[in-house]
Amino acid sequence: MSYAKQHLAEATAILSQLDPDKLEHMVDLLAAARDRGGRLFILGVGGSAANASHAVNDFRKICGFEAYSPTDNVSELTARTNDEGWPTVFAEWLRGSRLRAEDALLILSVGGGNLEKNVSPNLVEAIKLAKERGATILGIVGKDGGYTAQAADACCIIPTVNPVNITPHQEAFQAVVWHLFVSHPKLKVNATKWESVK
């Protein structure tokens, strides 16, 4: 089998294992946060940070949801990393943003964060703060979901079908899932350009 066929077969297998009911529940939680005047903070590291930035655009433009990602502000991100350290960079940014119970946190991560293994401790600390503040916590994560899956109000775990190709599929399916969210009738309030061109 060619690599292209293998990769597409793996993607098909992942898609068939996603739980539509869980995704609908996540949409309901996002809609509730928006409708009560909450904001959406989307956090990710590496490729997931780029996905977070794209998702912020979609939630703001398509869903009318006030959304932000800390990795969009490079000056603050690097200042906090330099002055306070990488593990607390997102939690401190959320404190500065006055995270409150009405808000929602969406974690995009390949592994979901794990303090014991020192993997994405910044996500773990941000989730802990969100828990303290009573904010809604959501995740689109892979592997076993890490701390995100343990602490979230709702979490989509992208299944691993080939341990050699975890990251490419995780980051690709983050986009599949958040695009499902922003195009969902419960969240979408504005037409996307190409669908509205006559």
Regions found by a protein language model. Give the residues of each.
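A short, well-structured juxtamembrane/interface segment
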Residues: 18-36
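Generic N-terminal amphipathic, Lys/Arg-enriched alpha-helix
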Residues: 1-18
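Glycine-rich, small/polar surface segments that engage phosphate groups of diverse ligands
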Residues: 31-104
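Short alpha-helices
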Residues: 132, 141-194, 198
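Glycine/threonine-rich flexible loop motifs
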Residues: 113-123
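Surface-exposed amphipathic alpha-helices with a cationic face
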Residues: 60, 124-131
